[in-house]
Swiss-Prot record:
It comes from Oceanobacillus iheyensis (strain DSM 14371 / CIP 107618 / JCM 11309 / KCTC 3954 / HTE831). It comes from the Bacteria. It holds the Pfam family MinC_N_1. This is Probable septum site-determining protein MinC. SUPFAM superfamilies: Cell-division inhibitor MinC, C-terminal domain. Belongs to the MinC family. The gene is minC. Keywords: Cell cycle, Cell division, Septation. Cell division inhibitor that blocks the formation of polar Z ring septums. Rapidly oscillates between the poles of the cell to destabilize FtsZ filaments that have formed before they mature into polar Z rings. Prevents FtsZ polymerization. PANTHER family: SEPTUM SITE-DETERMINING PROTEIN MINC. Interacts with MinD and FtsZ.
Length: 228
């Protein structure tokens, strides 16, 4: 069995205690040592409740095991857990973050009554016809005509933008901002994008060349769109 001192190390901080748990120890060993250390370090009844932060290192634990740790620490109500931190993230969270950071390239025409919705940035090679809708949690790039509805940053990302080779939408939405057809030129515009202007507190239309100076990450797409 490992030396108990190597399983859990307690360090005092201005906010309370930090518990560093050996990532190689079994969970059973961790719980056993935790019970002993908590009893030994328990403040007296007339002393304030102590805040505890648990550091797991490169160890991932389930919600059930996390709850077991909390119960051991708070069993006598002399400690309160203010955080359980790990250097690792659950697989589902990692996949979701990867989805949000990737650009989805889709070749199709979004026709009237159709909805195309994706996580992350969308690069649509094709048109959005009147009555069609494209929705993305990130930015929207359209190598084609935007004649329907586009909604970027639908999770609330106000930094998202919508760019199209030809823009004459019935509606643009970015986060919770909405801009309708009367806000645009009646004949439509080429190589333009919609972005939230924080000074005017609304969606405005600007050229892709201007936007590329503000958002360096779109420069590659801007060149592709300009080159057709």
């Amino acid at each position: 069995m490992q030396d108990l001192k190597q399983i859990i190390t307690i360090k005092g901080t201005r906010d309370g205690l930090s518990l560093f748990i050996d990532e190689d120890a079994s969970f059973e060993e961790v719980l056993k040592e935790l019970e002993e250390k908590i009893q030994f370090s328990k403040p007296k009844q007339d002393e304030p409740v102590v805040s505890v932060k648990v550091k797991l290192g490169n160890r991932y634990i389930s919600g059930e095991k996390e709850e077991q740790i909390r119960q051991v620490i708070t069993t006598d109500q002399r400690f309160k857990v203010i955080g359980i931190d790990s250097n690792l993230i659950p697989i589902n969270d990692a996949k979701r973050w990867m989805d949000d950071s990737e650009v989805k390239v889709i070749n199709r025409v979004v026709r009237s009554g159709q909805i195309l919705e994706i996580q992350g940035d969308l690069l649509l090679v094709g048109d959005v016809n009147p009555g069609g809708r494209v929705v993305a949690s990130g930015n929207i790039y359209i190598l084609g005509n935007l004649l329907g509805i586009a909604h970027a940053g639908y999770h609330g990302d106000k930094d998202a933008f919508i760019a199209a080779s030809y823009m004459k939408p019935t509606q643009l939405r970015i986060a919770d901002y909405i801009s309708r057809a009367p806000d645009y030129e009646s004949d439509g515009v080429y190589m333009e994008c919609g972005i939230i202007d924080t000074d005017q507190d609304k969606i405005t239309i600007d050229s892709l060349k201007v936007l590329s100076k503000k958002r360096k990450e779109i420069s590659g797409f801007e060149r592709r769109m300009n080159n057709g």
